[in-house]
Amino acid sequence: MESIIQQINQLRTSLRHHEHQYHVLDAPEIPDAEYDRMMQQLRDLEAQHPELVTNDSPTQRVGAAPLDAFEQVEHEVPMLSLDNVFDEESYLAFDKRVHDRLKTAEPLTFCCELKLDGLAVSLLYENGELVRAATRGDGTTGENITANVRTIRAIPLRLHGDNVPRRVEVRGEVFMPQAGFEQLNEEARRKGGKVFANPRNAAAGSLRQLDPRITAKRPLTFFCYGVGLLDGGELPRSHIQCLMQFKAWGLPVSERVKLCTGSDQVIAFYRQIEQDRAGLGFDIDGVVIKVDDLVLQEQLGFVARAPRWATAFKFPAQEQITQVREVEFQVGRTGAITPVARLEPVQVAGVIVSNATLHNADEIERLGLRIGDTVIVRRAGDVIPQVVGVVMEQRPDDTKEITFPSQCPVCGSDIERVEGEAVARCTGGLFCAAQRKEALKHFVSRRALDVDGMGDKIIEQLVEKQYVENPADLFQLTAGKLTGLDRMGPKSAQNLIAALEKAKQTTFARFLYALGIREVGEATAANLAAHFRTLDNLRAADIETLKSVPDVGEVVAKHVMNFLSEEHNQKVIEELEKVVSWPEPQQIVVEEIDSPFAGKTVVLTGSLTILSRDEAKDRLTALGAKVSGSVSKKTHLVIAGEAAGSKLAKAQELGIKVIDEAEMIRLLGE
């Protein structure tokens, strides 16, 4: 018995520590999955030994106490958390408990929503006006974050309509879309500031700033999902109708909500959301399942820390703990040196992960990482796995320091780091085999010259056998030479030659993008092509002329000039011009186009649901718009889809007009 008491006490101590790190300091040290595992272990032990349950056990409360830096707020209606299920068997057990308690065998209707991975907040409206916003805190006492929440443009300061209750407390999640998170971290790296491990931490850190002006600059947004206090008014008697009422009041509600009757429909919804998860544009960690009928919710009631009528059906963990075995350094297309951690294989989000990016030397220093450390690895959607933290309490005595190389690990050339840049680069250029390989892979990629069948392994063999040194050499290949490659028969070789022949006919924009000029992406390449129309015009441009193009500032202009003036690049382009051609761009006379988009610089952001992004770009361009990839003072209009992030925030900061996709479709039809 003593060993069980000791085990329970150890779990409670550890859980309290991690609750404080997560809920109060916003500095979690372990993945959610590890916390959930420990909590479940403690619950199981307490269930087996109920006499050992204490009032202060982590199983008997929601979270941790708030900091003293903010005014404390007592929740009139406690903000409880949800119990979790992690597989279909556990979900079916929840479904059975609900049916048993209601004493019914009839299929029940559940409202299924996304489980957002952000920070839970309470919004109190009095006579329709936002008077207070608070964090969940420990569920009973939170922190007053009204000044910060008022800076989030998704949250209305006054509710719409006439049927607003005298007092209503709306609950929801503040979160940061992935695009905004990535830009926030990129800016922080450039300035040597704090880099956040994930969007949830970024949202929490942004909301808990003592200076609301800092919060106002962060790309936060909000979805509501429930109500706490209600006084002087009525709500519908089903949860989904409540969500529709919130929407009518002007509160943002996720579109991915569905009524499901019976467990089969619930599980099908869960599987569909798991499949769609990577394309949402923001982080979720599961699906929330609620009995839709509010009368039935009242009958089911609550346990100590959670409602009986709801559960969170969580996805496989996106973060796991493993150990760093070694660190290697890879060389990219532009010479960027990227440290990569070789890991003890671990399953993350359903995939075995054995490698993870460490980004650069600054990131290694920020993490305080050493070889042999136990680390937290994160994999979200299609994002390359990355190390987001070190578990210092598990550091062994024999860890080794990571030494960043001074010479390229592939070609031996010096590595340099330009002042103000986080990335170190090999100076070998196309002398470096690694850079040659990556430049060629980019040149033949789908959005560049789109050489069908020319995969990475073929490029690697072509370089290793010294058949190809630069993009122009690709068009000198013969079927006979290609049959000398591994797994390349005569038919495959002929198909590849045919694909190369087809790739000779392209567009000026694709050609510029294929060259791989630093920081010239698809949008910038398209803008350069539209502005200069010919390669000769582009070659003749000076810095100031280049800077007049949308998306092109001082840095990009210098990259373009340096690339086009480099002797080796000039020779390669001359050879390519002999074989690659594109039609003369049609001159679009903006004055002759009767369209609200004519002559306007337009930026698309967020997820579009009616048109694909490429379709939207094509239709806007056809009506005389210049579609840019970034927001600046030159931007005339921003079209914001779902989960728009930092670009929307910047547009609002600069006072640029913003419309949604529906308005864009309407204007396209004019």
Swiss-Prot record:
Pfam families assigned: BRCT, DNA_ligase_aden, DNA_ligase_OB, DNA_ligase_ZBD, HHH_2, HHH_5, Nlig-Ia
Catalytic activity reported: NAD(+) + (deoxyribonucleotide)n-3'-hydroxyl + 5'-phospho-(deoxyribonucleotide)m = (deoxyribonucleotide)n+m + AMP + beta-nicotinamide D-nucleotide
* SUPFAM superfamilies reported in the protein's UniProt record: BRCT domain, DNA ligase/mRNA capping enzyme, catalytic domain, Nucleic acid-binding proteins, RuvA domain 2-like
Q: Example GO molecular function term?
A: metal ion binding
**Keyword NAD in record:** yes
| CDD domains registered for this protein in UniProt | BRCT_DNA_ligase_like (cd17748), LIGANc (cd00114)
Q: For this chain's UniProt record, which GO biological process terms are given?
A: DNA repair; DNA replication
Matching InterPro entries: BRCT_dom, BRCT_dom_sf, DisA/LigA_HHH, DNA_ligase, DNA_ligase_AS, DNA_ligase_CS, DNAligase_adenylation, DNAligase_N
What PROSITE patterns does the annotation carry? BRCT, DNA_LIGASE_N1, DNA_LIGASE_N2
Key words of the record: DNA damage, DNA repair, DNA replication, Ligase, Magnesium, Manganese, Metal-binding, NAD, Zinc
E.C. number: 6.5.1.2
Active site, per annotation: 115 (n6-amp-lysine intermediate)
Q: Which cofactor does it need?
A: Mg(2+); Mn(2+)
Q: Where does NAD(+) bind?
A: 32-36, 81-82, 113, 136, 173, 290, 314
Q: Which GO terms describe its cellular component?
A: cytosol
Which residues does the annotation say bind Zn(2+)?
408, 411, 426, 432
Q: Where is the BRCT domain?
A: 592-670
**Could you say which protein family the record assigns here?**
Belongs to the NAD-dependent DNA ligase family. LigA subfamily.
Q: What does this protein do?
A: DNA ligase that catalyzes the formation of phosphodiester linkages between 5'-phosphoryl and 3'-hydroxyl groups in double-stranded DNA using NAD as a coenzyme and as the energy source for the reaction. It is essential for DNA replication and repair of damaged DNA.
What is the protein name for this chain? Answer: DNA ligase
Organism, scientific name: Yersinia pseudotuberculosis serotype O:1b (strain IP 31758)
